[in-house]
């Protein structure tokens, strides 16, 4: 679970963040702030800017597989609001 940086399923306890990601997803784990030097950091790096953990509107970019689950962009345009369901 170290290479999940916002793209992993380390949010198993916060599946509801998908809706109110900006307030419910407050669970932003420190794992999300992993060094962007990671392979998936290319798209997830945007999270640091948003402070969310989804990589801004580059959600399609950080299609890191979301922890093996299908990442579904809740904010079809926002990019920050995926569901690890």
Swiss-Prot record:
Subunit structure: Interacts with wool keratins.
Family, as annotated: Belongs to the KRTAP type 7 family.
Any one of the GO CC terms: intermediate filament
Gene name for this UniProt entry: KRTAP7-1
Taxonomy, superkingdom: Eukaryota
Alphabetized UniProt keyword annotations: Keratin, Repeat
Protein function: In the wool cortex, wool keratin intermediate filaments are embedded in an interfilamentous matrix, consisting of hair keratin-associated proteins (KRTAP), which are essential for the formation of a rigid and resistant wool shaft through their extensive disulfide bond cross-linking with abundant cysteine residues of wool keratins. The matrix proteins include the high-sulfur and high-glycine-tyrosine keratins.
Keyword Repeat: yes
Identification of the protein by name: Keratin-associated protein 7-1
Lineage: Eukaryota, Metazoa, Chordata, Craniata, Vertebrata
Record Pfam families: KRTAP7
Region (12 X 2 AA repeats of G-[YCGS]) location: 37-82
Tissue-specific expression: Wool.
